């Protein structure tokens, strides 16, 4: 996982220590991808689908489910349906796991595989694509997406394209995600995501711009309970749990 620059946090009462000497050389030696920054213009979702169509090992990761649906729908029109896979939290966990197993098997066998997904594919999913498209996102999310490209370190470098989706409506799930993505833009790409100095700069900018977090931290440090209460806000739990009678669990659902 991408580690934040903890050394930049002056409010911490501990100092991290680098355990790998000359880690910059390690980053360079382990580089498996080339990053193409396409942020000087907006890219339509239809264009992304068109570019994915002729590729046989490609994954596009976007920030919103409706963007994933648009790209997948376009691919269904231009590619054999059994080569297109759609992964979002609209699918129940069991369904997603089954789809991931099918994708992994197809990739292993060298069969065409075009995947459109949201962030649910970025962590804990061991898939390896030749090409990955990533909608502009926080830097750690871009690095996670790049981890799905040339994961096995083949001779040829993997290709990661970071693009800004064309959409008149919101582009990100929430304000924090938006601010973190804007921070990436403010660093004036192109730059290497494999350089620890760039990762450090990103987190420094993010920490410096997080005024709400600073205010809350200062209130806690000052033991100002009234100010802490005013600043602190729990994440709203607006989700509703549902039962999905999927696959072999369908009979169990009926029996209940």
Mark where each language-model region is.
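Interdomain hinge/linker at the junction between the two RecA-like core domains of SF2 helicases
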Residues: 2-52
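Conserved ATPase-coupling elements of RecA-like P-loop NTPase cores
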Residues: 125-129
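A short beta-strand-to-loop transition that corresponds to the Sensor-1 phosphate-sensing loop
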Residues: 1-3, 62-65, 117-120, 136
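A short helix-to-beta-strand connector/capping loop
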Residues: 30-33, 80-83, 111-112
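Conserved two-lobed SF2 helicase motor
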Residues: 106-122, 134
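A conditional alpha-helix N-cap/helix-loop micro-motif detector
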Residues: 41-45, 96, 114
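Flexible, active-site-adjacent loop/turn segments at secondary-structure boundaries
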Residues: 28, 33, 89, 119, ...
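C-terminal helicase lobe and adjacent C-terminal extensions/tails of nucleic-acid helicase motors
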Residues: 46-55, 61, 66, 70-97, ...
């Amino acid at each position: 996982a991408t580690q934040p620059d903890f050394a930049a946090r002056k409010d911490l009462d501990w100092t991290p220590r680098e355990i790998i000497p000359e880690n910059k050389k390690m980053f360079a030696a382990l580089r498996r991808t080339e990053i193409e920054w396409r942020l000087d213009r907006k890219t339509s979702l239809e264009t992304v689908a068109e570019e994915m169509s002729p590729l046989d090992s490609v994954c596009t990761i976007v920030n919103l489910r409706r963007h994933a649906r648009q790209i997948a729908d376009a691919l269904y029109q231009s590619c054999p349906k059994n080569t297109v896979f759609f992964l979002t939290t609209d699918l129940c966990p069991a369904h997603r796991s089954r789809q991931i197993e099918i994708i992994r098997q197809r990739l292993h066998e060298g069969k065409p595989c075009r995947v459109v997904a949201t962030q649910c594919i970025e962590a804990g999913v061991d898939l390896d694509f030749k090409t990955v498209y990533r909608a502009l996102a926080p830097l750690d999310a871009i690095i996670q997406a790049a981890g799905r490209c040339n994961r096995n370190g083949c001779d040829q470098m993997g290709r990661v394209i970071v693009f800004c989706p064309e959409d008149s409506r919101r582009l990100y799930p929430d304000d924090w995600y938006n601010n973190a993505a804007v921070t990436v833009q403010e660093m004036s790409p192109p730059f290497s995501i494999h350089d620890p100095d760039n990762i450090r700069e990103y987190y420094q900018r993010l920490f410096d711009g997080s005024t709400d977090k600073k205010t809350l931290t200062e209130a806690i440090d000052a033991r100002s309970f009234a100010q802490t209460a005013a600043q602190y806000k729990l994440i709203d739990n607006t989700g509703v749990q549902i039962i999905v009678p999927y696959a072999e669990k369908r009979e169990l659902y009926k029996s209940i």
